[in-house]
Each structure stands twice: as structure tokens, then as C-alpha cells.
Amino acid sequence: MKPILLTLFFFFSFIFIGCSQTDALKSSIIRGEEIYTDFCVSCHLPSGEGVKGVFPPLAKSDYLFKNREASIRGIKFGQSGEIIVNGIKYNGVMAPMGLSDDEIADVMNYITNSWGNKNNNMVTEEEVSKIKK
């Protein structure tokens, strides 16, 4: 009897943890959309497509997923210098937006789950706080 109860306990624990992480991600994405609208949309556009050669796309962006830490650092501290996104070179400047670590996590979760992007590996405030210049 004990093995069955133990098995059921672990099974339902994993389901509960999975559901709460999914709910946390959904809430983060909703908050991130508002932050994106306030701080990012003027350059990267409502569609996340950016402006070719000027403002890199966030929609279906290979850079976001291949360079997660650099993407977070760019939002947190600003970005300058050449980057390559979807095979196209960009060499502009993005000023830091003055966002808190939790706001950066939220906007990253929104960006990496919008416009054809899909990321179940949630960006957290703790992860952002560990990113240094």
C-alpha cells in the first residue's frame, strides 16, 4: 500500500509544480506584453519584426534563443556593437530602459513566447539578477 501512496504523491506533486510554473509563465507573459508596449514597440514594432538592418527582429529571432544571456544583458544594460540576427548584421545602439529585474524577466518571457517564438524555459527575476555587465 505504501508504494502506491508514495507513487501517487510524487505524481500529483509533479503535476502541481508543472501547473504552477505554467501559470507563472502565463502571468509573466501578460505583464511582459505591457512592458513591451511601453518600452520596445517604437523600435521593434507591434509585430516584433523590427526594421531590417536598423532594429533587429524579435519575431522568430535566432539570436534570442542562441544568446539568452546576452539578450537579457542587452535589455538590462543596453546594447551596442555588431550582432547577427537571422543572418543579418545589426550595428546599432539600444539604450538601457531602466527596467527592474522582474520587468526584464517578464518582457523576455513575452518576447520569447510571441510572434512564432516558443520558450517553456521561463526567464526568472533571479536569473536576470545574476547577469552582470
Q: Where do the model's predicted regions map?
A:
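A contiguous binding-surface segment within folded domains or other stable secondary-structure elements
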Residues: 26-29, 42-81
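The canonical Cys-X-X-Cys-His
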Residues: 32, 36-46, 107, 111
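Bacterial Sec-dependent N-terminal signal peptides
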Residues: 1-31
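Axial heme c-ligation environment in periplasmic c-type cytochrome domains
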Residues: 52-59, 80-132
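Conserved Rossmann-like nucleotide-binding pocket used by diverse enzymes
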Residues: 15, 36, 95
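Electrostatic cytochrome c docking/interface patches
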Residues: 19-35, 50, 54, 130
